[in-house]
């Protein structure tokens, strides 16, 4: 006679009759085993759900990591910006920055000798043009066959030349004369102070 096997209790019943199975299913051991079985089943389902969500999250994070890796590779492939060089060290082949034009000196200011005058002050007459009509920038050597020497030097005798480069159309200032030295005695009321020869007498005294 075959016996009935209970999956929840993992036991064989003595008889396979419906009355015996009904009596076994009504017992407290069978009910406790059924409760434990479904609790384990729910725990397994919950764990499998958690594992699935974790795998999905890791898959998305992996996709983000792949995108980030591709972006980093793209950034590394781009050329880096040039480094700032310290002032005074220019690489070979590069032109230095263009400096602004010098400011015009104030009215009446004369540049030192040897320095070419960039701009004449307002109202000053312009120097005469060269003989052959070719203008040269200040500081440039003269053209062969044309009079004049380098800036700051007088023209060579026998050759025609224009005014010096520092000429601005104004006459030179008069020489500065110092006052005669005072006598060491400090006598400022001496009548013979202006007379260079004190022994000479005036013609009025002889009369």
Swiss-Prot record:
GO terms for molecular function: mRNA binding; pre-mRNA 5'-splice site binding; U1 snRNA binding; zinc ion binding. Residues 105-115, 122-131, 162-183 have a biased composition (Pro residues). Its main location: nucleus. The keyword DNA-binding does not apply. It is found in: Nucleus. Keywords: Metal-binding, Nucleus, Ribonucleoprotein, RNA-binding, Zinc, Zinc-finger. One of its GO terms (cellular component) is U2-type prespliceosome. The keyword Nucleotide-binding does not apply. Residues 105-207 are annotated as: Disordered. U1 snRNP is composed of the 7 core Sm proteins B/B', D1, D2, D3, E, F and G that assemble in a heptameric protein ring on the Sm site of the small nuclear RNA to form the core snRNP, and at least 3 U1 snRNP-specific proteins U1-70K, U1-A and U1-C. U1-C interacts with U1 snRNA and the 5' splice-site region of the pre-mRNA. This is U1 small nuclear ribonucleoprotein C. The lineage of its organism: Eukaryota, Viridiplantae, Streptophyta, Embryophyta, Tracheophyta.
């Amino acid at each position: 006679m075959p016996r009935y096997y209970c999956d929840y209790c993992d036991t064989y019943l003595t008889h396979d009759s419906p009355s015996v199975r009904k009596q076994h299913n009504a017992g407290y051991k069978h009910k406790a085993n059924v409760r434990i079985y479904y609790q384990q089943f729910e725990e397994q389902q919950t764990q499998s759900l958690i594992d699935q969500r974790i795998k999905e999250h890791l898959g998305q994070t992996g996709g983000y990591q792949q995108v980030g890796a591709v972006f980093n590779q793209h950034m590394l492939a781009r050329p880096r910006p040039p480094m700032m060089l310290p002032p005074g060290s220019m690489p070979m082949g590069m032109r230095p920055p263009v400096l602004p034009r010098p400011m015009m000196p104030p009215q009446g200011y004369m540049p030192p000798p040897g320095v070419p005058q960039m701009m004449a002050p307002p109202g000053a007459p312009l120097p005469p043009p060269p003989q052959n009509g070719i203008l040269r920038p200040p500081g440039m050597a003269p053209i062969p066959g044309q009079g004049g020497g380098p800036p700051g030097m007088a023209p060579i005798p026998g050759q025609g030349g224009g005014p010096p480069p520092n000429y601005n159309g104004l006459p030179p200032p008069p020489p500065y004369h110092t006052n005669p030295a005072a006598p060491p005695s400090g006598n400022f009321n001496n009548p013979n102070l202006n007379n260079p020869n004190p022994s000479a007498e005036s013609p009025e005294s002889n009369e």
